Amino acid sequence: TTDHCGSCTKCLEACPTSAFVEPYLLDATKCISYLTIEYKSEIPAELAGQFGGWAFGCDICNEVCPWNLRFAAESTVPDFRPRGDLREAGEDFFERMTEGDFQAKFADTPLARPGLARMRRNWRLAWASLRGAQRRAATERQ
C-alpha cells in the first residue's frame, strides 16, 4: 500500500473528540460519524459537547487532509447538493416533526438511517455544542 500521510498528523490534531488513537488507528466509539449515524444509545456526555454543530456524520478529518484536498471538488450531482430545508432549520426542527413528516421529507436520504428519534438526539447535541462553543468564545474574549 502507498502511504500518503508521511509525517502529517492534521487529522489527529483536528478531530474534536480525539477519535484517532494514533496515526492510522481510529477509535470509532469516539468518532462523530459513527456516533451520529450508527450509535443507537445515548451519546456519552464527555463526547456530546464536542460535536461542534455536526448532527449527521463529520468530515473534519477529510477536510484537513492535504492528500484529500488535492482532489476535493464540489459535486455537480444535484442529489448531492446541500438541502436548503436543513440549512435554514431551527433548533426545534426535528422536535416539531412527526414520524410521518420525517418519512415524507427524508425517506429517500441518508438521514433515514438513524431515523427521527436519533436525529432528534443528534440535533439537540449539535445545537448544544454550538451554544457551548459560543459561551467558551465569549469567555475567552473577556
Where are these regions (language model features)?
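Long, compositionally biased charged/polar accessory segments in the mid-to-C-terminal portions
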Residues: 104-107, 112-130
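Alpha-helical transmembrane segments of multi-pass membrane proteins
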Residues: 97-99, 129-132
